[in-house]
UniProtKB/Swiss-Prot annotation:
Pathway(s): Purine metabolism; IMP biosynthesis via de novo pathway; 5-amino-1-(5-phospho-D-ribosyl)imidazole-4-carboxamide from 5-amino-1-(5-phospho-D-ribosyl)imidazole-4-carboxylate: step 1/2
Keywords of this entry: ATP-binding, Ligase, Nucleotide-binding, Purine biosynthesis
Reaction equations catalysed: 5-amino-1-(5-phospho-D-ribosyl)imidazole-4-carboxylate + L-aspartate + ATP = (2S)-2-[5-amino-1-(5-phospho-beta-D-ribosyl)imidazole-4-carboxamido]succinate + ADP + phosphate + 2 H(+)
Alphabetized PANTHER family for the sequence: PHOSPHORIBOSYLAMINOIMIDAZOLE-SUCCINOCARBOXAMIDE SYNTHASE (PTHR43700:SF1)
Gene (name only): purC
One GO CC annotation: cytoplasm
InterPro entries, A to Z: SAICAR_synt/ADE2_N, SAICAR_synth, SAICAR_synthetase_CS
Transit peptide listed as a keyword: no
Family membership noted in the UniProt record: Belongs to the SAICAR synthetase family.
Annotated protein name in UniProt: Phosphoribosylaminoimidazole-succinocarboxamide synthase
One protein family per Pfam: SAICAR_synt
PROSITE patterns per the UniProt record, alphabetical: SAICAR_SYNTHETASE_1, SAICAR_SYNTHETASE_2
Organism: Cupriavidus pinatubonensis (strain JMP 134 / LMG 1197) (Cupriavidus necator (strain JMP 134))
Disulfide bonds: none
EC numbers on record: 6.3.2.6
Amino acid sequence: MSNALYQSSISSLPLLGHGKVRDNYAVGEDKLLIVTTDRLSAFDVIMGEPIPDKGRVLNQMANFWFRKLAHIVPNHETGVAAETVVAPAEVEQVKGRAVVVKRLKPILVEAVVRGYLAGSGWKDYQATGKVCGIELPAGLQNAQKLPEPIFTPAAKAEMGEHDENISFGEVEERIGIALARQMRDISIRLYKEAAEFAATRGIIIADTKFEFGLDENGTLTLMDEVLTADSSRFWPADSYQVGTNPPSFDKQFVRDWLEAVRIDGKPWPKTAPAPKLPDDVIEKTAAKYREALTRLTGEELQ
């Protein structure tokens, strides 16, 4: 586990905060250093053990997509190498896992796009026949492809709280009609293009979450992470079957173990502290992340 980074400590830059997975530092007035650690969060609780290489995998995967989708929407990239903004002794902490990005004004709405019925979307549909207030045809099954991808936004929650699904009308009220529609249309376009590409690599992108901010001119800008195994549900196309829970290339291993684990004979209540992850779950999860990178991008971990 020696190559794992649970939390960065960059003392040469002001720390802005630790997120669930990322540590953010200020680089001057207009840029940020984002370090993707090997922390893993499941059910909005941060696990106590790192997943080796996970941060580097996510960073490389996000950078791949930012480049691939740059013609659709501006993104937060600056082209400044992370190694150049930290002290020499700190370079090892940022190598392969950090980016220097534009400092944006974040839009506090998660832009979720679903192409398939899965997870909380499937639960919503079973209960109401809708997902986030969007009427869907009757008789759909778990993991079924939707007639068209749908935009199902969520309100960003405080750390440790669950993000809350909201209707498109609520997004319009929060950020204004024009910006809400632009965000929806761009999100669906990003999803469609990514899903088309992933299909050629034998991967289904069931759903994904985009995050946007506004730059100093008020331009909508893609930020944070994009189409990684943390922000998306990736399914291998060769084992996909409607009506089942397809195995995904993400933290599903950890989630399944957490659902099954018993603490003093009782299920884990999905609140901190998390139970200690066994080594085999950590190793299998690390392997899944690496496999997702190679299958999707054709790149080895750099």
